[in-house]
Amino acid sequence: SYRFGISGNYYVTSKLSIRAGVDYTKLDSSFGRGRGLGASISIVFQPSYRDRAEARYESSTDSQSLSYIHNSSNQIGSLGYGAVANRDNGAVNAQGFADYTANRFDATLSQATYGPNFKRFGAVNVTSIRVGTSIAFADGVVGVGRRINDSFALLYPHHNLDGRSVVAGQSLAQSDYMSKSGTFGAAVNGYLTSYVNQPIQYDVQDVPPGYDIGAGSVRVNPPYHSGYKLRVGTDAFASAMGTLLLPNGQPVALIGGTVIAEDGKDKEPLPFFTNSVGRFAIQNLRPAVAYRVELGGGAAMFKFNVPSDTTGLVDLKTITLKPAK
């Protein structure tokens, strides 16, 4: 037995293409189909990377097919659907499906119909519904999410975020995330791959101005079928900003220094610097703590307090250094 053929593609536009070919098949067995010379043609329309429609015909097997598929983005609330119809040597079958991605589960509905010919199309019908979910545990943290194939991470908010939701994914914008914390526990990222260095991205819903949630990404290298817990937020979440002036009213421009907690609980001082007009911003501050800023190796300094009830941003307005004695 052998088969050889040739085919080619022609792009009418960037979205529409035609594929055609001819082939010759010789089979030793008398039970095989598609002997001799045959031809095939297919027309493909793909308006986006998620949508594809195709019509196809093969003369050697006397088969035709027509399909349209819209792929889900796997984001929360996304919907995928499609339909395929085939006629093969007289037999006819068709299938339609839809899948939905929710925060805590995914679901698929499909309907398939078959008939030995057009007159008896619908003689066999199969309907299926599938719902997939998971309950994940990691060091005392629980989350309900979609199916987990390998490793996972549970993301939950620090208590000072006052119940705001944490999302696993790039951003809350346009639902660009895969899971969200809430009533049924932590946000579940169930798409980690074992033994691969990869980022876990996160964001916080309605985060208060000035609240420092961190880099928005943590890199991990999971062992086989492992789980992580990741708390989003910290005790040192506040940020302070203001303008620093000299006694004569001129800005303290382009100067560096250190920020030291008066309670002595910080392992290392925080960095401090001003821009060309004396503006500064300090991150990773703790509420109800007094701080001392030392400039230029301690030649000058000033102090400020972070209120105990701050939600994130502390506006220090304008600070004027005291004249040197």
Region spans (language model):
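Flexible, glycine-rich linker and terminal segments associated
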Residues: 1-260, 273-275, 287, 292-325
